[in-house]
Amino acid sequence: MDTKVLAVAALVIGAGAGFFIGKGEKEVVEVEKVVEAKQTSTLDAVRAKGFIQCGVSQGLPGFSNADDSGNWTGIDVDLCRGVAAAVFGDASKVKFSPLSAKQRFTALSSGEIDILSRNTTWTMTRDTQLGLNFAGVNYYDGQGMMVPKSLGAKSAKELDGANIFTNTGTTTELNITDYFRANKMSFKLVAFEKADEVVAAYDAGRCDVYTTDRSGLAAQRTKLTNPDAHVVLPEIISKEPLGPVVRQGDDQWFNIVRWTLNAMINAEEMGVTKANADQIASSATDPSLLRLLGKEGKFGEELGLSNDWALNVIKSVGNYGESYEAHVGPNTPLKLDRGVNALWSQGGILYAAPIR
């Protein structure tokens, strides 16, 4: 049976053709065309082509970043590799599409990519108006502001009249506007499409403030000429739950992506790592471990996968904690403590539904 798939042609921040959502919020969606396509599940499609196409950032250290040889690393990259391991038993069967914030939803809606795993904030508008589903949260964040130490500012409330740079197509534009209006401060906002353009302009001293998610500030700070000459102010002005996104209408694919993330979180809680996964799988007697590692029940079958899908994920990319520590943790250039991204049993809010 044929079905109509809406290809979203543009998602922009600002006034323009389309519709407005909420009180003055300016996320606008233009539908350029309707594509006639046969109804094929995403799982069938990726199996047919032999790989998963994953949408990532254009270069955000710790989350999705390519080295000089084109090898991608980061916690968002690990999630995509984990899905490939779940589907194919091979984490290498994934290709990466670097996308700007403005391009990302169009690429997913049109079918150019199978998963968007690109430091993307889960909001009501995005969840209910764009034909997309967020499959979970792999990093709890909040928006912050970075300034040169030479500015002398100790608080965001000292930034009246500031020139502020950020990216187009993001929640940061709306959040910073709300914050300055609520605190009765004036400001000038300039938005760039590419993150590297913002970094270069800020590094050249063309503005007073660079604002984005605090994890993003930590990542982009590593690219500055003199990182130690800049400081992230203490205020967190928003909630930014970041996570993977898929198209609506394919519950099986949504479940595969969601449960890949859940498996990584549950594995950390149960002490299953990349190094010990096989050994635990062969010796475990705890029913929860047996279910996670495919030794009991038919949980893989219910996803359309082999029963060792989660074991393959953990052996390939490790548990959530391993991924975090490798890419954004205290021993990386980002030096980010776990904070709220610690397990619920260790003072954080990270919590996955059980496999049962």
Give the residues covered by each predicted segment.
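Single-pass membrane-anchoring alpha-helices
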Residues: 1-26
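Extracytoplasmic small-molecule ligand-binding "clamshell" domains
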Residues: 37-117, 292, 305, 316, ...
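Extracytoplasmic/secreted envelope proteins and their assembly/folding machinery
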Residues: 40-43, 76-84, 102-105, 109, ...
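Sec-exported extracytoplasmic/periplasmic mature domains
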Residues: 47-51, 84-92, 109-113, 150, ...
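Bilobed "Venus flytrap"/periplasmic-binding protein-like clamshell domains
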Residues: 51-62, 70-87, 121, 141-197, ...
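Acidic, polar ligand-binding/catalytic clefts
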Residues: 81, 85, 89-158, 214-237, ...
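Conserved C-terminal helix/tail region of periplasmic/extracytoplasmic solute-binding proteins
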Residues: 326-356
